[in-house]
């Protein structure tokens, strides 16, 4: 979690102010600054504490089910007729996605800090479920803010959160999506700074959140790197992950950043196309600005107002991205590309039929990029795709879009 890096490494950020180049930082209300600094201090202490690491490792292994498998997607690979595609199976984790990795780390931090109330925001519902899960495990009350339109899209996950004892608060402001849920969670935090821990679900927000979320999620890439060396005897040629806020992607990417031979591709939500405003491709079509406490690429109009955006996937319709991704884009280390709704839907069905695995719509965006890339590569080439979550939560959405009455 805190190994030394070379000065010319891509792993040197963030600096003491939480900056990755010109991105990141701590743009928060004055009332929150002491809490942010307290969190930073608690995290610095925790990540150097062998007891903290041991407890997190034990929970990850025996509660979450790590390590997740690296699976050769033979059916999909043969169907496409190019590179060998491996799936990093984060869908097999407890709660069904990568979100549990971060939630376990942060709930242990909250405990260390003496916080007695957990708040979280969620889009696809997976982070809300994971937050409610760890809160239940440690006997803490949990409030989850969910955009009203996402409540409609993610009914099974809303029920799971309630079942786990969380209070679900729908947010109807704006378009009722992830951005609006995050706004409400920040308002709650400002009001209840004494006893409340804000368990952010993505690699965005004010420093130290982008760093600590990345560190807790880097277990994905650390495992995948070791697993591919064991299975193929070499590093992959390409790694691919979907990017909303960017936590599953930075978790896969970070351990590979200094491997120059590995091409890294982040996949954004292209929605209905980049020509209008019905997409969430902030790095393909946005520009730098400040949102939710950090400077990063954002979707905004000419006056700097944040646009709502659209994606078929509730977990990708965030109008910004984690600041480290913005820096990796500008530094040229990672390529970020958009995938359209219909391409993701096609990949969702193709993966299900060729592999017997129903992926989350977020993950389907990454698979859609693999569908484009793999046939252009030789059969001796190797690709890892992060299967960030399972698709049970999306079956109703997909059914509706395909004209099936569920």
UniProtKB/Swiss-Prot annotation:
Which family is this sequence assigned to?
A: Belongs to the TrpB family.
Where is the PTM N6-(pyridoxal phosphate)lysine found along the chain? Answer: 99
Output the superkingdom of the source species. Bacteria
Protein purpose: The beta subunit is responsible for the synthesis of L-tryptophan from indole and L-serine.
Q: In which pathway does it act?
A: Amino-acid biosynthesis; L-tryptophan biosynthesis; L-tryptophan from chorismate: step 5/5
* Molecular function in Gene Ontology: tryptophan synthase activity
Give UniProt keywords alphabetically: Amino-acid biosynthesis, Aromatic amino acid biosynthesis, Lyase, Pyridoxal phosphate, Tryptophan biosynthesis
Q: Give the cofactors, semicolon-separated.
A: pyridoxal 5'-phosphate
One Gene Ontology cellular component annotation?
cytoplasm
Class in the EC hierarchy, top level: lyase
Q: Which InterPro entries match?
A: Trp_synth_b_CS, Trp_synth_beta, Trp_synth_beta/beta-like, TrpB-like_PALP, TrpB-like_PALP_sf
Q: Which organism is it from?
A: Brucella melitensis biotype 2 (strain ATCC 23457)
Q: Which reaction does it catalyse?
A: (1S,2R)-1-C-(indol-3-yl)glycerol 3-phosphate + L-serine = D-glyceraldehyde 3-phosphate + L-tryptophan + H2O
Question: Which Pfam family, an example, fits this chain?
Answer: PALP
Task: Write down what this protein is called.
Answer: Tryptophan synthase beta chain
Task: Give the multimer and partner information.
Answer: Tetramer of two alpha and two beta chains.
Q: What is its EC number?
A: 4.2.1.20
